[in-house]
Amino acid sequence: MLVSRYALALTLLAASIAVAQDKDLVLYFDYESIDGGTILNKAGTGLDGTVNGQIDIVDGGKLGKAERFAAGSYIDLDGANWPAGTTPRDGMSVLAWVNVDTLGNDHAIFNARASDSTWLIHPEVRSGGNFRWLLRTDGGTTIFDIRAGASVASEWLHFGGVYDSASGAALYINGEQVGDGPGGSPIAGDWGMGARVGFNIDNARPFTGMMDDLSIWKRGLTGAEVNTIMDAGAIPEGAAVDAGGKAATAWAALKR
């Protein structure tokens, strides 16, 4: 029995180290530290975030520490200069652990607006007691608008919104699928009017509370991948880093 447990441990360790870099992970904030007003993007793209307002690293996160957002605070991603090749187009996933202070308002997990004024994405904790997952294509046409699941205040919940233009959309809360939507269209192609974590571009829907382990992908993850990332993080502790200094892939790659 001891030998078999040791062998299993070695197998899991080898899998962790051997995991290959996932080029579709474009943003990963593990919320373990703030570096002089900068939130480092652990996806290795070099596209870091800038703190605006009062955002603090606190204990009590789901996977280590977490980030607490005061009302009106946000992380600016400099959407106008986000590279086209890194902007999700044919697929997208947004995953995060969230713990909001109140359901007295809607809470924007992430928001971006295209240069043609399209409000292209809304992953939200809603004041009505549910969640929202929406994407739009060029010209402001809605691809899908999922409103489902049960939101509560002062409790950790995992949000997992995924989309693939070929197969459609799904919303997972705490790893369980609670809604789906159609595919068929590419996502609006740029973030020219801005991109933020925790506050809409027009200073609406402030996220107030704690957030942990936010990741954004330029493909639609599977339900199995969502569950793996929910439990282990987008980049598990101890995962390999390539020679170029970029982050190694998520555990999700092991599930393909």
Predicted regions and their residues:
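Extracellular glycan-recognition modules
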Residues: 22-26, 30-40, 45, 71-134, ...
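Surface-exposed loop/edge segments in extracytoplasmic proteins
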Residues: 119, 141-146, 177-181
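Extracytoplasmic low-complexity segments
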Residues: 2-4, 9-72, 227-256
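Short, solvent-exposed beta-strand-to-loop segments that form ligand-recognition rims
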Residues: 173-195
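Beta-strand-rich interaction surfaces with strong enrichment in secreted/lumenal proteins
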Residues: 82-84, 145-150, 183-185
